[in-house]
């Protein structure tokens, strides 16, 4: 086979496998906040399995732990900073009457 008809061969690069984000000693539990917080986005959403690089079983356990932590109020449902920037008293006038929004 002459050189012009030979298929292009890529050089083999060394492939380093990434370490799993959850070690064998880590317990997936709703009380382990340092572990759970790694799998939540800035807005408080649960990250997908592809982003987390978890197995199906690990992702299911993480999802259950996050939901338990949210229900027990150790983790917020939403992580929205705009919610806390609101002023203490907001008055809105509509015609002749004033409506107090913070009741």
Swiss-Prot record:
InterPro entries xrefs: Ribosomal_bS18, Ribosomal_bS18_CS, Ribosomal_bS18_sf
Location(s) in or outside the cell: Plastid, Chloroplast
PROSITE patterns: RIBOSOMAL_S18 (PS00057)
Keywords: Chloroplast, Plastid, Ribonucleoprotein, Ribosomal protein, RNA-binding, rRNA-binding
Gene3D superfamilies: Ribosomal protein S18
SUPFAM superfamilies assigned: Ribosomal protein S18 (SSF46911)
Signal peptide residues on this chain, from the entry's feature table: none
Domain of life: Eukaryota
Signal among keywords: no
Subunit structure and binding partners: Part of the 30S ribosomal subunit.
Name recorded for this polypeptide: Small ribosomal subunit protein bS18c
Species name: Buxus microphylla (Littleleaf boxwood)
Gene coding for it: rps18
């Amino acid at each position: 086979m002459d050189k012009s008809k030979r298929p292009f061969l890529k050089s083999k690069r060394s492939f380093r496998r990434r370490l799993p984000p959850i070690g064998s000693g880590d317990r997936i539990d709703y009380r382990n906040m340092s572990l759970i917080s790694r799998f939540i986005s800035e807005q408080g959403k649960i990250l997908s399995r592809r982003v987390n690089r978890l197995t199906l079983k690990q992702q299911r356990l993480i999802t259950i732990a996050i939901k338990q932590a949210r229900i027990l109020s150790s983790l917020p449902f939403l992580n929205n900073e705009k919610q806390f920037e609101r002023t203490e008293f907001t008055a809105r006038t509509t015609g002749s009457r004033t409506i107090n929004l913070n009741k």
